[in-house]
């Protein structure tokens, strides 16, 4: 009947209230750029010759980059299987840069809001790259697995690497700032809002409500409107449009 049997599901208790996403600290754009640069070094063969350890680092790297690009919740991404990767499409964005979009299915069984959603998002290149070095790529396999492929990549392993990455980019107070993997979703939403993506579109991709975005990201929406408003103050010469 078109339904798939998922043989195993893994859920861990969480203590994140629905309001936390708007209150959590996130990264500045400079900090995020530093993290991307650090991850290149962190996964380099020269600095990590042990293949098994390097593979784990690569998974953590692509887990980080996928979270920030897809706006997924950590639990949703950890439950994503290769059968949920529905397709890719190479496009050129509004700035002229080539991007690889990926279509993903977040199943209701793994979603916090218990609704299936299918989204097109950036970050397809990271998922493609993951498939080149992962030993577990069957349709029912999880994208981000532990070393044996039997469970999701462990929380202990993830945060062991997270601590190294945060210190590596000079954020010693990441615990005090409450920077976690979940902050990457917050960062992704923030960047989409600052880029002027309509709230309804951001909410749809993130799997949350428009009212939730409006409530907890209203300050960002206000900033965007202010920036748009300021563009009216540029001198307008005859024959030119007010918005340059």
Task: Name what the model sees in each region.
Residues 5-74, 78:
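Basic, Lys/Arg- and aromatic-enriched nucleic-acid-binding interface segment
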Residues 11-13, 19, 31, 38-40, ...:
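Conserved tyrosine-mediated DNA breakage-rejoining catalytic core shared by Y-recombinases
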Residues 21, 28, 110-131, 140-164, ...:
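C-terminal catalytic core of Y-nucleophile DNA break-rejoin enzymes
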Residues 26, 98-99, 108-112, 206-230:
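Catalytic-site neighborhood detector that most strongly recognizes the C-terminal catalytic loop/helix
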Residues 34-48, 61, 83-92, 145-146, ...:
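Short regulatory "switch" loops immediately downstream of catalytic or recognition motifs
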Residues 41-44, 51, 88-90, 95-98, ...:
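C-terminal secondary-structure termini that scaffold catalytic or DNA-interacting sites
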Residues 41-54, 70, 135-142, 150-151, ...:
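Short, basic (Lys/Arg/His-rich) helix/loop patches that form interaction surfaces
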Residues 75, 156, 211:
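Key DNA-contact positions within bacterial/archaeal DNA-binding proteins
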């Amino acid at each position: 009947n078109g339904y798939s049997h998922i043989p195993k599901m893994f859920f861990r208790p969480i203590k994140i209230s629905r309001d936390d996403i708007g209150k959590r600290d996130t990264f500045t754009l400079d900090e995020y750029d530093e993290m991307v640069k650090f991850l290149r070094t962190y996964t380099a063969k020269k600095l990590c010759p042990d293949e098994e350890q390097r593979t784990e680092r690569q998974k953590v790297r692509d887990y980080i980059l996928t979270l920030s690009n897809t706006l997924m919740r950590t639990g949703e991404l950890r439950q994503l299987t290769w059968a949920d990767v529905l397709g890719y499409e190479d496009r050129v964005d509004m700035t002229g840069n080539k991007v690889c979009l990926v279509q993903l299915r977040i199943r209701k069984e793994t979603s916090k809001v218990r609704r299936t959603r299918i989204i097109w998002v950036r970050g397809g290149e990271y998922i493609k790259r993951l498939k080149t070095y992962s030993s577990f790529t069957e349709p029912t396999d999880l994208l981000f697995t532990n070393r044996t492929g039997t469970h999701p990549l462990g929380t202990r392993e993830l945060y062991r690497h997270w601590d190294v990455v945060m210190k590596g980019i000079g954020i010693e107070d990441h615990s005090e700032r409450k920077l976690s993997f979940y902050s990457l979703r917050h960062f992704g939403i923030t960047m989409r809002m600052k880029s002027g993506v309509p709230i309804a579109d951001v909410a749809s991709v993130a799997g949350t409500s428009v009212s939730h975005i409006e409530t907890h990201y209203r300050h960002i929406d206000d900033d965007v409107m202010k920036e748009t408003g300021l563009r009216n103050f540029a001198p307008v010469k005859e024959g030119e449009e007010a918005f340059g």
